[in-house]
Amino acid sequence: MIFVDRTDEMARFRAALTQEKPSLVALYGRRRLGKSTLIKKVLSEQDVYFLADRSEAQHQRILLAKVLGQQFPDFDKVEYPDWEAIFRAVNYRTEKRFTLCLDEFPYLVEQSPELPSVLQKLVDERLLKYNLILCGSSQNMMYGLFLDSTAPLYGRTDELMRLAPLRLPYMQEALGLDDAGTIEEYAVWGGVPRYWELREHRASFEEAIWHNVFSVNGALYEEPVKLFRDDVKDIVKISTIMSYIGAGANRISEIAARCNEPTTNLSRPLKKLIDLGFLERDILFGVDEKNAKKSLYKIADPFMAFYYQFVVPNLSFIELGRRLPIEQALKAHFQEYVSMQWEKLCREACTGNVINGILYGKAGRWWGTLVGEDKKLEQAEFDVVAESFDKKYLLVGECKWTNKENAYRLIAELERKASLLPFAEKHTIVPILFLKNAPTEDCKQAMLPKDVIALLK
């Protein structure tokens, strides 16, 4: 698969590694995002890349010495009793500055808790003659090592980067998909390059899902558990919470009831999942997040959302190789699932972008009770709501992932409901339809997948 995006990260790497003094760079993020691939794109032939494992410290030093032996002849002929000894030995042998990358750095720290203090000493004394890249998939450990104010390496990095999933347009570029196909496939694979690579190896979207996800031998069959192992101690509880949310329990009271626990017991695991990027809080548009009492918990990662909606309920069928029940579940609910991901993408597309000459702020959802002119109450939901930066306009959007929509009817109903919103006063309402296909009528207020993809670039 072609290497796409990451231009900002590569530029930051190169700037740090070529500055006058040796640099310390840290890179972290969940697995499968391409951290190692990115680093290898930056490293040159004279640089040294070392991938740590979970073996004992002395064995790790032996392995590192062997790798360094390719750069410095006979470097591995010596036994190094501790980490300071090996780093100082590299210093002694360094004549021309190069870069040493320690990938999965948290594995080294697990076996040698003193390692961050050793590196702090070398950095503070300005003894290093070479650049150091420290990379890790354990977001908790990397955060604790570099962002905790009490940690030895806090404030010592020249660059500290958290790698995020790639944006949707880059998947279209990497896999050569049409616009609607890009939306549907992103709803499953999300912005994770490794998943795109697995998809590319199969002839079709359907084949890729069955081969990698709905198979006991599939590369992604146990993916969530593998991801949780890096950062979560109680995997059973975390996976249970994700399962309930994936099944539609979105309020904390609903999740607590299914877990048979008080809501107070869920605050920490829910926050943990949000910090790791697996969950998000859906808050009413216009409400400050800190003061929000009315919120919904949703699975943030598309693949995780797909997994907990379609894989977890069908694990028994997958284990038995029963394909038909899974096919029926996909036929009945997959398009509805895509429509939920489509809504989220439409909100992202509107946030901070110019649409029809108007710049909008952060887009969100709104749901609740509207009061009509006749004082009649009605329940309503708006998929997309965004206020313009000048406070003059209010974009309200309806998202549909179905065919042959009556655009005029939808626009009229959208305008009617929007006029009843409690915060609509003194705003010009801008109704927008986000549709899978072009409407049967000529409608200038419709945005299609190609328009949304363009805004997400």
Give short role names for the model-derived ranges.
Residues 295-457:
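A cross-kingdom feature that marks ATP-driven nucleic-acid transaction machinery
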